[in-house]
């Protein structure tokens, strides 16, 4: 196995938080730090006409990325680590900052058919 991909669907998030680029950029940085992951550059964010944001942070272990839909009070969050990072600790940063009313989490093994290295 290459790594774990944590997919988080966060619902019922205050719309103003989902358009706050500063807050979400800080979440990316803090999530990497808390998860013991190593950024290879600064967070990158793009704002769309409707106010939604897409952002990502490239990591030496892979990436953290999100897409916000403020009109639906929803954020899709991906945390993929092919190293020793703690994806759940990284997720906790977003949960604390965004305070979703509901969440749906899925963890997917990536490269499951590839033998683990020693």
Name what the model sees in each region.
Residues 1-118:
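Polybasic/polar functional segments that serve as interface/processing modules
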